[in-house]
Amino acid sequence: MNCNSEQEQQQQQQQEQEQHRVTKMKIMVFDTETTGLPPKNRQCTDPAQWPHIVQLSYLIYDTNADKIHELKDVIISLGTHIPLPDESVAIHGITRTISLQQGIDIRIALFDFKMALTQCSKCVAHNLEFDTRVLQMEAQRNRMSLYFPASFCTMKVSTDLCKLPSPYGLGYKWPKLLELHEHLFQRVPKNAHNSKIDTIVTLRCYHMLVHNEDLCRSSREFRALFRNHCTIECERDELGEFGDMNEMPSPPKPTELKEKND
């Protein structure tokens, strides 16, 4: 990628962040766990080539009220006919038994997701392109349609902020969600590869990237949610549940982190 292209991409990302920063809205943050990897050709439109969803999680956050309106987390029933490789189970921990006993029909999950999506002006995800494609392929399999509003990918927007070296030697690699969270807050959340946890973590990262504000400091509701789902015991003592949020150590803001890395 040449210098002009990099500058144009950075300017576009800055414009997107500024647009999100000044606009108050309801946003949907979502994540999926799947039966496997996407096809090598990400533009493939054949649903048979795409993995199935085994867990779908999303939340609706009102930036006007600074409040979570809905938090949904469902396991999907794969039946006995959809392959569920052991290597995928090793990542997300959802076995065939869990899927059969706790899962719901994918059509119900998609309908609820679609209705929730209509309430929102923006959707947010980490590696958004993958999650939207997986959802669209599931919708296509079930003769449904999904339309996503304006979107924000925390992975792509934060690439130049995290500055993680590419294994291929050119530019920076896309940061994983835990890498981004560690970069912003100097801690690694627990229970990764659970789409509910990843959704909560993504919201915290998004809010810091766009609003320069840590929700664990500014929102008692979110702080309790994050404390109960995403922290280890020693971090819970630091976060507290009913203590003074102003006593928490402030993480560096993204602008400060950028200056340190430059």
PLM regions: where:
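Short hydrophobic/aromatic-enriched beta-strand-loop microsegments
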Residues: 145-152
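Ser/Thr-centric signal marking residues that sit
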Residues: 32-35, 154, 202
